[in-house]
């Protein structure tokens, strides 16, 4: 069930720190909507360079992937009233101006603002859910799906966060040990950290064994690998 504006404010001002919802800075009370909170875009972005990259392979080493990601994305900081231009078909990363921390009994869903969506601007591709326990600034996955360039200015309200009650407080919060959380405490626009997925080491070992001829590849290889994966992380 979504939190109303009254419930959102009540949790922001809660006396008990573990139950407190943190959103800072709150520049205007206009950011409070009937059952959501408007988020502003910050000043740092990462835009795609015009480079040739064959593919991103999660099985290569982390150092190789880091070099590829840095080569692929160019960080820029936008000054006030200058803005960044998102051309038709372009993709960029941005982040919220606000720092957010969710308590154990509140999750959140990130959505774009209809005003910008009607111009073709998408604020997130897949990362729309925020787990209880998350702390940091949310990253936007920005894409211009229209046919006219759009200028984004730091401080504009481009997204909204809808908060939802958990029937029971989460036992393992985002950022907890073993939770495989890759973006806890991020304070700037953060590129993909897919290479830090804990399960990838399992697949890397199997790949090395296969290349060395120590691993037989049966017809039901995927079933066998998934069975081993389940047993390893059980």
Over which residues does each language-model region extend?
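DUTPase catalytic domain/fold
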Residues: 1-234
């Amino acid at each position: 069930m979504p939190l109303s504006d009254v419930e959102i404010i009540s949790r922001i001002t809660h006396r008990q720190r573990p139950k407190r919802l943190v959103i800072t800075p709150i520049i205007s009370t206009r950011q409070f909507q009937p059952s959501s909170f408007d988020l502003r875009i910050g000043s740092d972005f990462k835009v795609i360079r015009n480079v040739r990259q064959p593919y991103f392979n999660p099985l290569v080493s982390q150092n190789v992937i880091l070099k590829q990601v840095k080569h692929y994305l160019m960080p820029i900081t936008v000054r006030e009233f200058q803005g960044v231009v998102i051309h038709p078909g372009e993709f960029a990363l941005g982040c919220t101006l606000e720092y957010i921390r969710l308590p154990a009994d509140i999750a959140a869903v990130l959505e774009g603002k209809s005003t910008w969506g009607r111009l073709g601007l998408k604020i997130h591709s897949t990362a729309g859910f925020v787990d209880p326990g998350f702390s940091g600034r949310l990253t936007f996955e920005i894409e211009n799906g229209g046919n006219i360039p759009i200028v984004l200015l730091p401080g504009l309200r481009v997204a909204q966060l809808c908060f939802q009650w958990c029937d029971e407080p989460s036992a393992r919060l985002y950022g907890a040990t073993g939770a495989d959380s890759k973006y806890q405490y991020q304070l700037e626009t953060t590129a993909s950290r897919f290479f830090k997925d804990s399960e990838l080491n399992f697949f890397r070992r199997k790949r090395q064994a296969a290349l060395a001829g120590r691993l037989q590849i049966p017809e039901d290889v995927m079933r066998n690998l998934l069975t081993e994966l389940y047993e390893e992380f059980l």
